[in-house]
């Protein structure tokens, strides 16, 4: 039982809700996933980190997690640490940087791609949220970065 209105109670209800929605999706040939941002790294009632609690209290049969690597880093955590802590739970990877992919140096794409198998990555989505140049040039820089990065090729040749 939880105290009605407490953050812990609300958190428990969300996990139960996600499990139920995920189960219904599975029964209808779909998948249900959750995409993080930086606020999931706040502690709830000074206890667990919200993202950890969600991963630990949702059923992997019903709920997958799409890791947004940029927001993990902005939340002051390591994507690879999460891969190792929760292997197989991140079947979708959302790669993003401050601007064009690989330009800020803050995300650590080499370690992310080298450990994608541990994460359970099946699909990757790339996003450019902000641009340092015209949009099409920004997209080209990001695509070129992915095509030329040796760790991207290495992680998919295994």
Task: Go through the PLM ranges and name each one.
Residues 13-28, 57-58:
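An active-site-proximal structural segment forming one wall of the substrate-binding cleft
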Residues 9, 33-35, 64, 92:
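Intrinsically disordered, low-complexity regions enriched for glutamine and histidine
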Residues 1-5, 9-10:
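Single conserved hydrophobic/aromatic residue that forms the stacking wall/gate
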């Amino acid at each position: 039982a939880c105290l009605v209105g407490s953050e812990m109670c609300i958190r428990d209800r969300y996990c139960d809700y996600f499990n139920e929605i995920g189960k219904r999706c599975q029964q209808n040939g779909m998948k249900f996933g959750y995409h993080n941002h930086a606020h999931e790294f706040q502690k709830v009632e000074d206890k667990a980190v919200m993202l950890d609690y969600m991963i630990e209290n949702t059923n992997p049969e019903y709920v997958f997690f799409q890791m947004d690597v940029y927001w993990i880093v902005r939340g002051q955590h390591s994507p690879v640490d999460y891969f190792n802590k929760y292997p197989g739970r991140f079947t979708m990877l959302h790669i993003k940087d401050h601007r064009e992919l690989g330009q800020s140096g803050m995300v650590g794409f080499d370690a992310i791609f080298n450990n994608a198998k541990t994460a359970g990555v099946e699909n990757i989505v790339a996003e450019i949220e902000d641009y340092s140049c015209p949009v099409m040039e920004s997209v080209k820089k990001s695509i070129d970065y992915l095509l030329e990065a040796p760790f991207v090729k290495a992680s998919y040749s295994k």
